[in-house]
Design a protein with these regions (language model features):
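Surface-exposed helix-capping loop/turn segments at secondary-structure junctions
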Residues: 110-114, 215-225, 242-248
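Aromatic- and histidine-enriched alpha-helix N-cap/loop-to-helix transition segments
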Residues: 1, 6, 61-72, 93-97, ...
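Short amphipathic alpha-helical segments
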Residues: 327-331, 344-351, 356, 360, ...
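Internal, well-ordered domain-core segments that constitute the primary functional module
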Residues: 66-137
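Well-ordered alpha-helical scaffold segments within catalytic/enzyme domains
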Residues: 1-9, 69-86, 204-222, 270-280, ...
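Extended, well-ordered alpha-helical scaffold segments
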Residues: 7-20, 84-105, 209, 220-238, ...
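Extended glycan-interaction surfaces of carbohydrate-active proteins
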Residues: 15-60, 115-200, 236-324, 357-397
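Alpha-helix boundary/capping segments in eukaryotic regulatory proteins
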Residues: 5-13, 29, 57-66, 79-92
Length: 397
């Protein structure tokens, strides 16, 4: 997203490299390993991805995914391309791979055909330690012999009090072993997996990605209508199943328990970015963003805390339990712009710029002090800072 503004070749190389390790069934792993890179957890030997008949032979990957922003990123590169012909050639090559990625999600992760896909691990949400997952993960009462051996690397570089607890990592590791023991066969995983969640952020970004893939299809002379229809189906399903009228926000749904997860987090306002709510619901969401525990209109707070600051598990510096994340602010900013909430979007834009210039490119920031925490050279923070700094909004070519 950042390279697109000044290094088109680098931007296309980054995306292409990831898709070079796409699985045969369309799964796009969240990690492609460099075997020359030093110690990392979870590393190559932890995943046992090779047990899947769909995993690539020529590279080593993880066995889980991340939110499907890739079609959106490809369109982002095209809209900022200095060499438009090269950009069209690039997304011509990527178009079938993007299609296979989305088809995998709807085929394997939406078995009832609702239009909503599920995630099967907290890591797949991108919000590993969110309090959304607490009630789901607490159902996993593990015996010592059920916990795979592992050694955390994160707490050697970041304060332990800012990171997930060891008990959470035990459950993260157990789920990976659960997948590997079933050879990453989605049907077998689905039969007994204790973590199957229809996540708001993931589905909102998938809906937006299908909208953007439809735009790419049109630019390539392909029929965009099936993609547009699928995006509308996802938006409709989110509005029917995930909307919380009382609180003016969308909620994740726990498939194993058959109920919504009543935890209020800023990422669950991201449906604005995909134009999922109607104008009335969008107004409710903006009110939630301004007046509830997210405090967009509160000048004493650095917006937007990732979790309701009045919530039971709020902690201003602990991973996804309160800190401000630039990527969530960026998504909310763009969503607010889509609905014409320019003043609120401007506050988020100014926050992104001031956090990065005053503190640096940190992984996340304390909403009560504005201080940076986590990694101090975090790539998506830098990338989105560049996007915000270099232009206020994308062109629509």
């Amino acid at each position: 997203m950042g390279y697109a503004h000044y290094a088109q070749d680098r931007a296309t190389t980054e995306i292409t490299h990831l898709f070079d390790s796409q699985w045969n069934n369309g799964l796009l792993p969240q990690i492609v390993f460099n075997p020359r890179f030093g110690e990392y957890f979870p590393g190559i030997d932890f995943w046992h991805a090779e047990r899947s008949r769909n995993a690539p032979c020529e590279s080593k990957t993880s066995g889980v995914v991340q939110p499907p922003i890739h079609a959106t990123a490809v369109l982002h590169v095209y809209r900022r391309a200095r060499d438009e012909a090269a950009a069209k050639k690039f997304f011509g090559r990527l178009f079938p791979k993007l299609g296979a990625w989305h088809e995998y999600l709807y085929r394997e992760r939406d078995p009832e055909g609702e239009g909503l896909v599920y995630i099967r691990h907290p890591w797949e949400s991108g919000m590993d330690n969110s309090p959304i997952w607490d009630s789901v993960m607490e159902r996993l009462q593990l015996l010592p012999e059920q916990i795979p051996e592992y050694r955390r690397a994160d707490t050697r570089f970041v304060a332990a009090e800012d990171r997930p607890l060891d008990a959470a990592y035990d459950r993260f590791a157990y789920l990976v072993k659960f997948f590997a023991d079933r050879d990453y066969d989605e049907a077998r995983i689905r039969e007994g997996c204790p973590f199957l969640v229809q996540d708001v952020l993931f589905n909102a970004l998938l809906c937006r990605a299908d909208q953007d893939l439809a735009r790419i299809a049109g630019l390539l002379g392909e029929d965009p209508k099936p993609l547009e229809e699928r995006a509308r189906k996802t938006a409709h399903a989110m509005n029917e199943k995930l909307w919380d009228e009382e609180h003016g926000i969308y909620l994740d749904f726990d498939l194993a328990a058959g109920c919504p997860l009543q935890v209020y987090v800023a990422p669950n306002l991201v449906p604005l970015y995909a134009a999922i709510p109607d104008e009335g619901r969008a107004a409710r969401m903006v009110s939630t963003l301004e007046n509830a525990g997210f405090g967009l209109s509160d000048e004493r707070l650095t917006p937007v805390p990732s979790y309701d600051r009045y919530g039971f598990a709020f902690f201003p510096t602990r991973y996804w339990r309160g800190p401000v994340w630039v990527n969530i602010n960026w998504l909310l900013m763009r969503g607010l712009q889509r609905y014409g909430y320019e003043e609120q979007a401007r506050r988020l834009r100014e926050t992104i710029l001031s956090l990065c210039t005053d503190q640096g490119f940190y992984e996340y920031y304390d909403p009560t002090t504005g201080f940076g925490h986590g990694s101090d050279l975090f790539s998506w923070t830098a990338a989105l800072f560049l996007d915000v700094m270099l232009e206020e909004r994308p062109s629509e070519k």
